[in-house]
Curated annotation (Swiss-Prot):
Chain segments carrying region Amidoligase domain: 1-266
Record's miscellaneous remark: CTPSs have evolved a hybrid strategy for distinguishing between UTP and CTP. The overlapping regions of the product feedback inhibitory and substrate sites recognize a common feature in both compounds, the triphosphate moiety. To differentiate isosteric substrate and product pyrimidine rings, an additional pocket far from the expected kinase/ligase catalytic site, specifically recognizes the cytosine and ribose portions of the product inhibitor.
EC number: 6.3.4.2
Protein name (record): CTP synthase
Pfam families found in the cross-reference section: CTP_synth_N, GATase
Length: 546
């Protein structure tokens, strides 16, 4: 199969939405019957985002094969059916690490290792490998044109443009076209300078995606075409919209997919965007609203919980309600108690690391349990629910996780001491082990208890979900917790590890050690999130009857 490559760059400012634009184009091409994948090339020196602060970088998205990747890969999976893997995201740090490892082995036969050709060749090899087996591979370059960090990546795709030729490569550049209220018009000069910067390193854009808070007038598009040497039909206006799921249709209406298909000489059907039209209709026509309290520690940056936010919205679509997310700092719960949890239709405690705010999450789980409020715990959210139950129902006062209190008399949650690395090797872990790459990661089979809420949600006795954690339920206390009434509704493939818990005599109190948000999509939703939002809606109706 001959793969065509679309390289997506950004200019003027960061956060223009390259990932959304790339994913939206991929969605249209997929709707035309093409097999599409998307890659993200990140210019930072970290080997992966696994140890980066969520409040700086946003969430870490985990792929099925256990790669810790940029949150943009979450957008990719929500827009197209293709599942991402570790080949879809790599960083400057990863490239340098691999090149230096080869140098130490002597693979370069004593050559002087340089950015060109050794680093650029390594980048090109990864891009080609990531695109294999697909009709089209869209490659997003992180950062902004002009950044020092991005230069090796830009040089690499410039070389690929020459080596593969125009019939297999296309360069798409996102820029900002701001509107100045004082002048009463949009300004194209930033775009002109951004394209000039891109052309100075040897890349001539074939398509310009012009971002702004309004549509770009036809005369300004003609001006951009003239000064940037891009044909007018390839100057695409991408205005702000109230839903990112409207963007595929917006790009389709301007013929972007036709331009791509013609450029690559591909024969395929017209795009069928009916699934996206249905998503947009559901989003615009809810029959009610539920308020979900998300109790976490990274709430100052909602992108830290990006996939959870989106999964709740998807569940709202399936239940025909809009979901309003109330972000609650778990430390505020510690300071003010139950009062900050009033007026909610459900509580969700997402994943996280570290001791700060953990008692607030435990209090949130207790409030939900005692007040029959729907509760959904994810990863740490499951662990705090189990700790709360152990303390206040099972009689294990001061029960805790060894992550937060190594001297706890009841370590109901403990460190996983053995794991398999990305190369399949069994490694031993201890408290002093590296933080990066030393977690239980990726898709794992889970056996579900027949008759449980989990089994009802999944409509079966098994599920496969993605993990990212280094602490697990301590099996030593399983029997005592079960005797106190806790239901272990999900177990690992070997039935040795607890994957899900729930409460029997509660309207909906379900928690999982995995991260179901990573597999939720706007078209398909996710069974656990759908069940949670349905329970929240039912709770609201019960409250209204009282």
């Amino acid at each position: 199969m001959t793969t065509r490559y679309i390289f997506v760059t950004g200019g003027v400012v960061s956060s223009l939405g390259k990932g959304i634009a790339a994913a939206s184009l991929a969605a249209i091409l997929e709707a035309r019957g093409l097999n599409v994948t998307i890659m993200k090339l990140d210019p930072y020196i970290n080997v992966d985002p696994g140890t980066m602060s969520p409040t700086q970088h946003g969430e870490v998205f985990v792929t099925e094969d256990g790669a810790e990747t940029d949150l943009d890969l979450g957008h990719y999976e929500r827009f197209i059916r293709t599942k991402m893997n570790r080949r879809n995201n790599f960083t400057t740090g990863r490239i340098y690490e691999e090149v230096l490892r080869k140098e130490r082995r002597g693979d370069y036969l004593g050559a002087t290792i340089q950015v060109i050709p050794h680093i650029t060749n390594a980048i090109k090899e990864k891009v080609i490998a990531g695109g294999e087996g697909h009709d089209v591979a869209i490659v997003e370059i992180g950062g902004t044109v002009g950044d020092i960090e991005s230069l090796p990546f830009l040089e690499s795709i410039r070389q690929l443009g020459v080596e593969l030729g125009r019939d297999r490569t296309l360069f798409m550049h996102l820029t900002l076209v701001p509107f100045l209220g004082a002048a009463g018009e949009v300004k194209t000069k930033p775009t002109q300078h951004s394209v000039k910067e891109l052309r100075s390193i040897g890349i001539a854009p074939d398509v310009l995606i012009c971002r702004g808070d309004r549509a770009i007038p036809a005369n300004e598009r003609a001006k951009i075409s003239l000064f940037c040497n891009v044909e007018e039909r390839a100057v695409i206006s991408l205005k702000d919209v109230d839903s990112i799921y409207k963007i595929p249709a917006l790009l389709r209406s301007q013929g972007l997919d036709d331009l791509v298909v013609k450029r690559f000489g591909l024969e395929c059907r017209e795009a069928d965007l009916s699934e996206w039209e249905n998503v947009i209709y559901q989003e615009a026509n809810p029959n009610g609203e539920v308020v979900i309290g998300m109790v976490g520690k990274y709430i100052e940056l909602p992108d830290a919980y990006k996939s959870v936010n989106e999964a709740l919205k998807h569940a709202g679509l399936k239940n025909r309600v809009s979901v309003s997310i109330k972000y609650i700092d778990s430390q505020t719960v510690e300071a003010k108690g139950d009062e900050v949890l009033q007026g909610l239709d459900g509580i969700l405690v997402p994943g996280g690391f570290g001791e700060r705010g953990v008692e607030g999450k435990i209090l949130a789980a207790k409030y939900a349990r005692e007040n029959e409020l729907p509760y959904f715990g994810i990863c740490l959210g499951m662990q705090v629910a189990l700790i709360e139950f152990a303390r206040n129902v099972a009689g294990m006062t001061d029960a805790h996780s060894t992550e937060f209190n190594k001297a706890t008399p009841f370590p109901v949650v403990g460190l996983i001491t053995e794991w398999v690395d990305e190369e399949g090797n069994v490694e031993q872990r201890h408290e002093a082990s590296d933080l990066g790459g030393t977690m239980r990661l990726g898709a794992q089979l889970c056996h579900l208890l027949e008759g449980s809420k989990a089994a009802q949600a999944y409509k079966g006795n098994t599920c496969v979900e993605r993990h990212r954690h280094r602490y697990e339920v301590n099996n030593k206390y399983r029997e005592r917790l079960e005797q106190a009434g806790l239901v272990f509704s999900g177990l690992s493939s070997d039935r040795k590890l607890v994957e899900m818990i729930e409460l029997k005599d509660h309207p909906w109190f379900v928690a999982g050690q995995f991260h179901p948000e990573f597999t939720s999509t706007p078209r398909d939703g996710h069974p656990l999130f759908e069940g949670f939002v349905a329970a929240a809606s039912a709770h609201q109706k019960r409250d209204l009857k009282k």
